[in-house]
Each structure stands twice: as structure tokens, then as C-alpha cells.
């Protein structure tokens, strides 16, 4: 199961935008693009001048509800599940361009509250109300400061308990394209944000959001690096940043139904049994799928073999969801989080419509592994019937 939410606020912090007293006080709270940038010698002077960006999500009460134990959490529909693996996802707004040097971005948890503001980088004069490289709220207001109350320009972040292994980062190797969507595992930070003090040895922190930046060493050295652009929460596209809570919700209930023979994958087809065609944004959708043989063996019986429901082999079937217009996969296959379940009526899976953008059409696709295998793919089966998410 994947339950995703879009960000509530975000902003890019620029070390220097223009010459003058307000050069590090520019607010960009409603820009449609979030930037990681490093400028060396330019019209701004001798650098380097960096940018980082901040982003915050309102964590749902349903996720917070398990915080007292960290053993169970509660779905929006009231059912319980184990602590989720949580991913922070950004969609690239860069052009296709290969990197000449390796580069990587990292995520840290912000330690102070901040005002997103309503400025743009292009504003003249500069908008100084809202967070900036120097201030958390406005020019002349409160500086960014670390836990020792020392000014920390560029945003203050929490330190990591005992091990740097919890620092999420994305590595861009030489030859990678800048036009790459990225996903960070932020389960550690979400656990700290939702835990009660002292639970499982975690030090509770307040949810002030995340900072995405380059490694400090890469920011201050003299190397020339590329710039990264991602769509913000203010984009007019479908590519808003997302926080994805993922867990295994699959169930396999013993059934009197027969297993579908997948020995010859080109001789089977899969379809939806209960597609309503449109679903309200915010509801949890339960799709029932049926697998059948294209050419069932002829038998003498009072019922047609074409009416017999058979189930897909246990642990071999997974789903994905594609945007019908763009052809892009919006819920990708995952051998843990998109497993197909079974009950007495047949195979099914559930998705939250909040994972999808409203007023768009989507298509399901089923992936099958060889029976008993978790690696040998035998076929992909696009579902002919599409569906729409409506407001």
C-alpha cells in the first residue's frame, strides 16, 4: 500500500540574489521551481553562492496516531498497519543533460519554524517577508540558529543520533541525466517526528519540514557543479512533491477457487471485475481483478469455463498505475508495497485516490512473476478498462 500526500509549503533559499543589503533576504515562497544551485564567478561577484530548498508536509493524524508505540499505525479508513517506510519524492524540471561530474543531494530535518512567504526570485524589488538565506521570517527578523543559539545562515537542521547512516541522499553518477526524479528514504526522520519522547530510544523532534542541499564540502569548494530544478507545491503541473507512506497491506486468505495456470503467459488475460469508471478524490478504491485462460480446455459441464474465476499464484502478482495522457507511471511496481491480495471472492488490491491527481484518467497494469519466483517476470498485462479520479 502506498499513501501519499503533497507538500503544504516550500521555498528556495538563495545565498545571494542581487547586490545590496537584501541580497541574502530574498523570499521565494510561491516560485513554481525549487533549485539547488552553485554559482561561481558571475555578475553577482566571486562565489561560490549556493541555494538550498525547504519543504514541509502536514503529516496526517492517521500516521501520527501510532506514535505512542511505533508498533502500529492507523489507516485513514481505521485499519491498522506496521510503521511505514516513508519516501520524499521530487519530480525533475531539468532539461535532458548528462552530468560530467558526480554529484549528490542530501536531506536533513529542519530544527526551527519558518515562514514560507509569498515572494518570487524574479520580484523587483526583492520580497523580504518570509524565510530567506539569513532569516526564518523576514529581513531584520529572526536569524537561523543552531541548537547552541549560534547563527547558522542557510537554515538550521537537526543532528543525527549516533549514526550518519540515517542521512538520506541521492547520488548522481557521471553520465546520469539531470532530468531524473529523485526519492529519499526519510523513515528515520518521520519516526522521530511522530514518536513520543523516549520511545525506542528516539529523541522526538517537531515537524518543521526538510532541507534539501548539497554536502557542505561541495558547497564551499571551488568546483563547478550543475544545478538541479524540481517542481514545487505551487506548480501548475501534476508534479507536486510528495511524501509517500508505504507498507505491506497484502493478505492471502485460503480460497476454494482454483489457481490460474501461468505456464503459458501469452495464453492468459487479466481484467477488472468491478470498475465503476470514476472515483472521488479522497476515497480508498478496491479493485478486483480476474485472470482467465484465453483458450480454456473444453469439458462437459453445466457451466461455462469462461465464467470460472481463478486466482493468480501467491506472491507472483503486482500492480502499477499509469497516467493515461502522459503514459508515466504514477504508482510503480514494488515487490513489497504493491502486492496483490486474495480473499474468498478472488484477487484484489486497494489504492488511495489521494495518490493521484483529480480530473485525470488512469490505467492499471499487472505484472506477473513465474509461480513461486520473485524475480522471473513472465508478463505485463495492461487493463483495458480505464478509470478517472474526480473532485
Tell me the role of every PLM-derived stretch.
Residues 1-278, 290-295, 317-320, 331, ...:
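Secreted, disulfide-rich extracellular signaling modules
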Residues 83, 205-207, 282-284, 314, ...:
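Extracellular Ig-like/FN3 beta-sandwich strand-entry sites
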Residues 181, 284, 344-348:
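A generic structural signal for beta-strand entry/edge sites
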Residues 208-215, 354-377:
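Internal, hydrophobic beta-strand segments that form the core of beta-sheet-rich folds
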Residues 297-327, 331:
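Short flexible loop/turn segments that cap and initiate beta-strands
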Residues 310-312, 316, 339, 343-354, ...:
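Extended, charge-rich low-complexity regions and/or helical-solenoid scaffolds
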